Amino acid sequence: MTRVARYGKLVAQEGRGRELAELLLAAAARLEDEPGCELYLVNRQADAPDTVWVTELWRDQSALQAVLEQIKGSPETAAAMKLVAAAEMIELDHLGGKGPA
């Protein structure tokens, strides 16, 4: 199986970065028991407080797709998306490093 890594860059509406980050941190907590999610980190850009980065690592593409299907149309997803002014998702090939091997 090939792990799937992603960086998500989410720019919140002006002044709403903290609120967006809190919703994403709640999403991270809900993923604690999701075996296919190996890493879900939420970070705020130091020089741009309305920009939130999410770093994800998934067991494989099917694990990612299963979670995306679960959250599609959920109230939590809708609430977060209302705060997003711009978004970019960067797909990566996980090679290794410190953390999950």
Feature roles, as predicted:
Residues 4-10, 41-68:
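Short, well-ordered beta-strand segments in beta-rich or mixed alpha/beta enzyme
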Residues 31-39, 57-91:
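An amphipathic, aromatic/His-enriched active-site/gating alpha helix that lines ligand/cofactor pockets
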